[in-house]
């Protein structure tokens, strides 16, 4: 043998696999022989036809042997050895199939190939007798768009037809005959068509007999929740019929549509064929007729009709003593649709008979083309209404339906003996028809059906509805049925139904759909659908009629069919329980049983005790592959037996009545059998190194195990569940949970058994075993089942079952002992039951053992060995783990039996297990009273402290245990910490202390992992930690703490206190979600407080400290108010913004400013949107108090004292027209006392004033009219005094700056350590970044990079230089761009308050100077902060020495001397707050500030602009002349786009164009320094233009320069030039005023004033 290699096949040596042995059917004694001429290739699959066969080898090649008349060469027609199909070489074939005379193959990419006989179109080729070589069949789905080629999974071939199963689980058919299932009369069909009737269903397998087809279809998912419709959607007949006679009731729910097909009227006319299949129960009731009637060939239709109706009337005459006149029960129960036209039917039948059965002469029957077809038609026609049948007969017939009719009340009649009625009662729905149809029912038949019925699933495949609620049939077994007394016949059916409903508990033991397992393993929830010719009953519908379309064989529902085989005229269905149902022709005993009739599925009786795991059906025989005791498959044959030589008696040319065991044990292990007409073939594997034997052992034991589990489920579990008084609801629920998990496990085992059977048919690679690849499926199912059964055990389930179940258990003691494998007769029933329930767990040991056996067949280094070895230990580990779980459960149960009863009820839980308790391990409470009793019980989820009649439960997830150090005086002490308690336990000895500590630690650890029920498989999860973590996640409800009473916390803990992220919820709806520290809210968090009165909630998001709101936050009130700002001790404290109401609400307003202890105090701005007023001033205790300014939307301006929210004391009031009042006020806008009123023209009144401004003022005083000659100094000084009563700029927004200093760790401005400040900045950035990571807003990449660069502190060593100044400037720009940085936050807040102050009503020209002062104040205060952070930065106005030499000297624009720095220092070299900070601050504040400038200069700007527009109407030459520009500076030529053009008198906007463009950029800059650079550049552009035209160096004098610059300013057309000029003037650095830029600015200013005075002549 080869050395063992990687794959399992190679490990064995491929020579010893897939050996082909062939037998001749019916010859005895049977001697198998090797296939003549076949070499040693491993065969995976074989298929046999009538005289030929096909082999598929492991490498995907196909060989044909036998008689091959379609081949071209004479040698190839009868080859001596199998010949290779060359057309398929290069294609990897995965499956093959043969019909009687044709073959098919499917490649791995889903293409089907056909070859052989094609007279009926069975090879999908038109007009060709033979297809000599494999030819690809084109199958395309015309419904799909675009057209898609259909990929094929499996083929099945009959005599004249072929079916293909596609990868999307649909059936495609071609060939000839009704067995195609297509609605057509045009045969042959050579283009594959979809069998529409099964479209949308999942078809698992197809099989073809000679002239019939079978399909295995997955059941639809249960529609339990949908209401059952009353009528059939297709034929509108009642789905449930009830006939209520005087003395009996018949209820039937076995409605079946004719052909199961939707019929429109037009279809009915066009295709009369569709009505050919009557509803099944009707046919079923007639089966005696068809079994016993043979109509002669030459009889006319009429004769047959009469004959059959005569049969119908007379067939039951044996028991009809009283004839009740009336309509036949059959037709009254359900109106069968009559044919549209009898003639059409006959025509159709004639057409069909042309394609009738091609009988083999060997079959011993003459061709009878018309007979079966006429038989089909008869039952469809209405019986004549006068037909007299007894009501009794109709009851018998309705009982006999093969689909299963429920009889609701017994029928009392002398004609029908009780025994017969009982026989009908005790048959299962599946067997009913079979037994009723046979003339006599033997005791064996009755016994057989009883057993079958007990095994049957209770709720599978049954419909329920309001009419049919008689569930005793399913839940209470056959025995209960015999107890219906005769007197019930007088009771109304409704009462009967009510009684039945009360008594029965419905238990569904069929597991629900389990997605994962069903996707990986074969489904057991299947239905069998059949169609085609049915003359021999091979369709299984209880009649001998053909079906043109698939129809479900109802009595196989719930039988878990996993494989179908079709012989010539019979069918076999193999179930997951290793049973075989057979139906159809039984001429030679090929069904494996002699029961009658053979038109419905009956169990084949194979004498072996073991189950069948594979079947094959030949033309007139069947093969059964069974499990044997030594796991080597045994082969049974049932069917035709040829007579021995010299024995010519015709009766010997029959068959075996019972299946015969063939002796083939010497061959090896048969993996697959295939049957043809005269021969059958087996594929055999040699058992090398025990590999094959181990695989067979695994498969056989799994199938047996499934049978045992099924028996336990049906014979023990179901009866137990249906018992009355099962105890408490909990017990019943637990038992139901056990039953449901048991069912799930049982179903999985059934699926696995089926998958192992198909695994043995294939390549048999160990690595593809489901138990290896998807071991978690099995491990989880066993674990779940063990959990449920141990829970049941702990709750005393078995003890509670004892009483109600004792009768049942006593009656079934032998069965119990047999199933549970308990041999000792003295064992108590409950113990046996206990053993029985724990039986499945043992299977894990078997898995481990078999996998280990398989592993030994591989080299130790191979991956297979490793995988098998690992899986084996996984299963073994789980088995031991579950064994421990069982012991724990028994130990816990023992404890509950001794525990005081009252406490048991509250403490006993299904999943709770006892670990240890202090009655046997001395443990006492420290400082306990002398007479107190303290009992400590450790469970897997809690530590219980019991005292007398009270107890306290401490959940383990929130319990911390630590040993006390000896210094603490606790020698054997354990300190226990829980969220609200702390106590010390003293143990008697150090050993006890260690034991308890270890037990508690392990229990806590297990509780935290949440893995107490999980097995220790997987990666290293079995490693126990020495002690549980101090920091952990857990959930806890407080019961003691007054603040937290009844609140539930879910989150992180540290040593008994919430610490880290968590959620705290109070019963009244309050909720906090965020960070905790030492048990208190601390850090960033969100808090919600419901406001029941307003049906809304208050909501806070922000920072907390020691359980209180502290730091920045946003509080949204239920009233709609929102506060954003600082908090301290749950109160608003510091800078904040309060928004009240929306613009549409009754009192919208906004306040931004300082708060102290929840009240407005200090400087603040209040915007009263309703009144259109804005107050900017001081506050105290929520009212305006002190100096302040009020502006209104009507242009009024007040500046002065406020007291208790009112203008009171001295003040100044200005109106829009510059009227001024300066004096005393007593209320808002109310003058009261001494004062001076000055008119816009300078006249003024001094005296006493009283009254409200704007509504008449009473004056007592003197009127002054200043003379024209009075100088300015004698005029009122009001305008000069105007800013005296406003709040000084440095007093504004102190809280904002204080907050920034506080963030840097300073008590006040400049009071702190620099290193500490930088540490605080780093912390602020990191925490903010962490919070941002959790928040939904994702930072952009550039923002992240900025943050990272800000975390580096700029280091400056050595003398301060321009480079270092530049570094600081860059750092500040980044910092101010990032709100997470304290400086960025400061700038953001200042921008917000500035805009809030000077936007809207605040955009008042009177406020301009205030606004400018405020900016200067910001600069001063921010510069102080910057100098604190960068101590090496020189103070304001200092000059930084230049480190690099000066660039090449540039001559001064004005003086012509070389530029000397001392005279005109450049900005950037002199350190000023505005130079450093304005570039950061001003762009953000520019819009409101510039608006104030524009308002203030409104009038003069209008005059300026009018002049600009007027002067700009002139052409260049005229304007230059008008402005007095010297002619030598006039450009003569201009270069436009590289071309030189002469300046003409009409030329406009062309001279000095570059200078004009340059000056226009002044409006796009923000800071004065940038604006000054623009002006300087403009001058240089003018200079360049003049130099170009003069071609000589010269010096500008102001007289020469001014007119030229004036021209440029005019042409630049800057709309708000005045505002620009004033802004520069107010904010430029003072040191620039006398330098070059200062002079240039003065020139611009002069131009502005000059333009206003220009008059154009």
UniProtKB/Swiss-Prot annotation:
InterPro entries: Alsin_GEFs/MotNeuronReg, DBL_dom_sf, DH_dom, MORN, PH-like_dom_sf, RCC1/BLIP-II, Reg_chr_condens, VPS9. Residues 901-1007 form the PH domain. Signal peptide: none annotated. It holds the Pfam family RCC1. The modification Phosphothreonine is found at residue 510. Residues 445-455 have a biased composition (Basic and acidic residues). Keywords: Acetylation, Guanine-nucleotide releasing factor, Phosphoprotein, Repeat. It comes from the Eukaryota. Residues 432-481 are annotated as: Disordered. One of its GO terms (biological process) is vesicle organization. Residues 456-467 have a biased composition (Polar residues). The modification Phosphoserine is found at residues 465-466, 483, 492, 1335. Transmembrane segments: none annotated. The modification N6-acetyllysine is found at residue 533. RCC1 repeats lie at residues 60-109, 110-168, 169-219, 526-577, 578-628. Residues 690-885 form the DH domain. GO terms for cellular component: centrosome; cytoplasm; cytosol; dendrite; dendritic spine; early endosome; intracellular membrane-bounded organelle; lamellipodium. The keyword Repeat applies. PANTHER family: ALSIN, ALSIN HOMOLOG. Forms a heteromeric complex with ALS2CL. Interacts with ALS2CL. This is Alsin. It comes from Pan troglodytes.
